Structures are given as C-alpha cells and as structure tokens.
C-alpha cells in the first residue's frame, strides 16, 4: 500500500473509532403506566437528569403505557437485555422467585409513608434489593406510588361487602390470600387489560392507588371507591446487572446520582399526585367515594390480619417480625 493510501486508511480508521466512541449509551426504560402518574413522571425526570449529568454520553428512551412491553413481558425483557431499566411493582418479584418482596403486599403492614420509609430507605430494603443480583438484576432504589383502595360497582363499607366479587390483582400469593380472606374471587390480570375487563364485567372491582385509578380512567367504570388504604403499591427501580456492571465507572457514578435525584423526586410527588387524583375523581361525579371511620377501618384490619400469619412461611417470619420491630406495629393490640 502506498504511504498516502496507508495514511488515509489510518485517518479513516481513527475517525471511525472516534465516531463509535461518540455514540451515546442507550437506556431503554419501559413501564406500564401513564406519563402523568408518579412512576411516569419519575421516569421522565430520571431521563432528564441522566442525560444532563452524563453530558450526552447516555440517551434514555422512556416507553410508557406498555407501548414496548406488557406487564407480564417486561421482566423477561430486562433479563435478556432487550431493555435496560424497569420500575416494576414490588409484587412482580415473587413470581420471579424472590418471595420476600411479597412482604410489601401484606395488608396494613405499613401505617403510612413514615413507617414505609423506615423499611425502604433502611437496611431491610437494601437487603431485599441485593437478593435480585442472583437473577441478573441490580436493584437501584424504591419508588413510591401510594396506598391502595378498593373499588367496585357496589358500596364497599365493610369486609363482607367484597364477598363474591371478582377482584383484579397482580400475580402475588399474598394478594390472592388477601382477597380470599375477604371472600372475594381474585383474578390475576395485566394492568393494561384492567379497564376493559372492568368495563365488560370480566372483573367486578380492583385495588389501586388513586393515581392509577384516575389516569387509567377506571373511575369511569367503577361506581364506588372506598378509601381503605389497606396496602402499599410501590416500585423497585432495577437494571440489567450485566449492562450496569459494564458501564464506564464515571458514567455509572453519574447515573447513580441521577437515580438518587429521581428517587427523591418520585417519593416527594407520590402523595401529592394521589391527593390530586382523588380530587379529580371526586369532581368527575362518576364515582361515589367513601372514607371509612376508625371502627370500619379496624374491621378491615382485623379481617386481613390473618393474611400475615398465613404468609409467614412464604415471605419469611423473621422478615415480617423485623418490619414489625422497625415500624412498631403490634398485631396483638388490634
């Protein structure tokens, strides 16, 4: 090869390598809810901060509302590397084989956000995230959504009112036991299918934080909503472990900061978003809203406490007891 030709080839090679080096790292972030939910807003905030902090080295593509993968598909997509990040509900990890996460599904185990954050922001929560590593997943943080309430097409003022109702749940042995303890018939169903199922009568009711109920327009096909706040629905922000470990150290550090900022934002707005959604449901006039008094809420607690005992072996008695100790919950005082 002539010297000039060799020089030209070397220059072209260097330019090609530089071009490849300049290509941003793409993070596909799939989720199943609307953009204007706590998770949807947090995902968009993470995108904004990740791209800013890495100065364009990372591009985050957010796919909301099951536009890329449905509820039951996204975990496998993450494990095979088809997407890089998810924020699935905590109930999703039980079917994955990490049954301890179903402790978050236990009814009334948390009496509000203060109790919850003692767990999710402490060593118990970190220890649970670390259990995902064996599944090829790195757990990054917990994102709040809110506390769930029951909805149906008939009034639900006592535990007995749920008897015989077909209630949609996520795939969770704990949630299955919860509904059966109330005499309801649990129906596992993907989140994206719930509105149509309620509309057509395939299921009679569901349990959701109010932001999910409102943004998915479920209030349009549910005549009654009872503010039981009986259970928590939150998310774990997770990533493919091989992808995360393979990132350049500086980029990973910048993304860790973006995760921290997005988590603070997510958990700050969660309660506000649910309060705003409740106000919008009320103003819509489509759904009658019932707020149980202390005695009525206690009746729901007593009816559902047996689920804790039944699920001890599944989620781990030591784990349940450690949460009781952390939050000060004492079932004997009910």
Located regions from the model:
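N-terminal signal peptide c-region/cleavage motif recognized by signal peptidases
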Residues: 16-19
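N-terminal secretory/targeting leader peptides
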Residues: 22-115, 123-334
């Amino acid at each position: 090869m002539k010297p000039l030709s060799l020089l030209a080839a070397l220059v072209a090679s260097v330019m090609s390598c530089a071009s490849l080096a300049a290509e941003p790292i793409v993070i596909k972030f799939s989720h199943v809810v609307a953009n204007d939910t706590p998770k949807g807003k947090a995902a968009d905030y993470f995108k904004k901060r990740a791209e800013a902090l890495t100065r364009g080295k990372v591009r985050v593509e957010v796919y909301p509302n099951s536009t890329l993968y449905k509820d039951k598909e996204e975990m496998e997509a993450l494990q095979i590397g088809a997407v890089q990040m998810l924020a699935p509900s905590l109930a999703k990890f039980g079917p994955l084989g990490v049954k301890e996460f179903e402790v978050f599904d236990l009814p009334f185990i948390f009496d509000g956000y203060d109790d919850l954050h003692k767990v999710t922001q402490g060593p118990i929560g970190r220890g649970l995230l670390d259990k995902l590593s064996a599944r090829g997943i790195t757990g990054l943080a917990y994102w709040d959504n809110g506390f769930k309430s029951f909805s149906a097409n008939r009034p639900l003022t006592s535990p007995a009112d749920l008897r015989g109702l077909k209630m949609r749940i996520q795939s969770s042995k704990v949630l299955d036991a919860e509904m059966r303890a109330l005499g309801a018939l649990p129906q596992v169903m993907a989140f994206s299918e719930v509105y149509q199922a309620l509309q057509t009568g395939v299921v009679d009711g569901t349990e959701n934080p109010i932001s999910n109920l409102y943004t998915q327009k479920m209030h349009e096909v549910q005549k009654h909503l009872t503010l039981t706040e009986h259970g928590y629905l939150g998310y774990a922000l997770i990533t493919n472990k091989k992808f995360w470990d393979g990132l350049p150290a500086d980029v990973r550090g910048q993304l860790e900061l973006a995760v921290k900022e997005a988590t603070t934002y997510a958990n700050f707005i969660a309660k506000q978003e649910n309060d705003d959604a409740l106000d919008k449901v009320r103003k819509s006039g489509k759904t009658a809203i019932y707020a149980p008094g202390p005695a009525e809420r206690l009746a729901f607690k007593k009816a559902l406490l047996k689920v804790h005992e039944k699920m001890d072996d599944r989620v781990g008695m030591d784990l349940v007891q450690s949460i009781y100790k952390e939050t000060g919950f004492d079932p004997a005082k009910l």
